[in-house]
Design a protein with these regions (language model features):
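Membrane-anchoring hydrophobic helices of lipid-metabolizing enzymes
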Residues: 2-143, 176-178, 187
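Catalytic core of membrane glycerolipid acyltransferases/transacylases, capturing the structured
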Residues: 101, 135-194, 206, 220-233, ...
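Non-catalytic C-terminal accessory region of glycerolipid acyltransferases
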Residues: 2-10, 16-19, 26, 89-93, ...
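Short Gly/charged-rich anion-binding patches and loops
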Residues: 37, 71, 127, 151, ...
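General small-molecule cofactor/ligand-binding pocket signal
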Residues: 122, 191, 269
């Protein structure tokens, strides 16, 4: 059995436990350590100053970012065909500003105190989670890919809401180790997606809230085609089944970074009424994404290959 196979078996049982390796100090990683040092310094810079720095950096680089920008343009053209080029470019530039503000704030999220992070957060609709807990339900949070998705997951822990989630390990072991330490520092468990869904569901049954990302494209075989904004999307249909297996209600939540208030906002909606029909269940999920994203499209991760799987097999994204 290979080391990677052993690791998957261990994480399937207990969740990922990050461990330090002396190889992380190899000179090839010194650039990463330098970047970490800069982020840790920025953790103590007032957020308004840091956000201004991030905005200037983003606007300077926005037009130089090739493939991610092209993917965002393709996604927005299909989802909002009535938009002008000016509208689309404005959203993309604002998105890159949001990216930079969130990225330069990673150090703050990773090392500042629980009390500090609580002050930097705001909930809209928290009563929906409180009510579900009071009624004795397990909870799966259905969380679309907003740029503040990792920050909000960590912040939820500080408010006494431990999370369990599935993730794709980073290709660099040092980055994977550091970021998993940050994600788990207040509790909760991360599970490698390669282990399947059972470890994730097991921790939900134990009382942790599931942090489920619904909008990646996993191909036609695992998906159904349902409407997504003005186009369609290969969407995973198993949310209702997952909720039943975990004996949980599904509560939609969307994370945003509000640069005006300097707070990470988490908007929470009432529990979803999911259908037994896979297509109706998948469409209900996309409707929640549309509700969250439409008023603040710059907060959404448009650079993903969200629409990769097309009915006619067309490859819409450049290599």
């Amino acid at each position: 059995m290979t080391d990677s196979q052993k690791k998957l078996r261990i994480t399937a049982r207990a969740g990922y436990e990050p461990h330090f390796s002396w190889s992380y100090l190899h000179p090839k990683n010194w650039g990463i350590w330098l970047g970490i040092f800069v982020l840790l310094l920025l953790a103590f810079v007032p957020f308004r100053l840091r956000d201004k720095m991030a905005e200037k950096l983003a606007r300077a680089l926005a037009k130089k970012i090739g493939k991610p920008r092209i993917r965002a343009e393709i996604n927005l053209k299909l989802c909002f065909p009535d938009w002008t080029d000016e509208q689309r470019n404005k959203v993309i530039e604002e998105m890159f500003v949001t990216v930079a503000q969130v990225m330069l704030g990673i150090g703050e999220i990773a090392i500042r105190s629980k009390k500090h992070l609580q002050k930097r957060s705001e909930f809209i609709g928290l009563e929906h989670i409180k009510q579900a807990k009071a009624e004795g339900h397990n909870i799966i949070l259905m969380v679309p890919h907003g740029w503040a998705i990792d920050a909000s997951g960590i912040i939820l822990h500080t408010h006494g809401m431990p999370m369990t989630s599935m993730y794709n390990p980073h290709r660099n072991p040092l980055v994977d180790w550091l970021w998993t330490l940050a994600r788990q520092r207040f509790g909760g468990k991360m599970h490698a997606r390669q282990n399947g869904i059972k470890p994730f569901l097991a921790h939900i049954k134990q009382g942790q809230m599931g942090y489920y990302l619904p909008d990646e494209d996993f191909g036609a075989e695992q998906s159904v085609f349902v409407d997504f904004f003005a186009t369609y999307k290969a969407t995973l249909p198993g949310l209702n089944k997952m909720a039943k297996l975990a004996k949980a209600v599904v509560i939609p939540m969307f994370p945003r970074y509000n640069a005006k208030s300097g707070k990470y906002e988490m908007e929470i909606r009432p529990p979803m009424q999911l259908s037994e029909d896979p297509e109706q269940s998948a469409r209900a999920m996309n409707e929640e994404i549309e509700y969250f994203v439409t008023p603040t499209p710059e907060q959404y991760v448009w650079i993903l290959q969200l629409l990769r799987t097309r009915k006619d097999g067309e490859d819409i994204y450049p290599d």
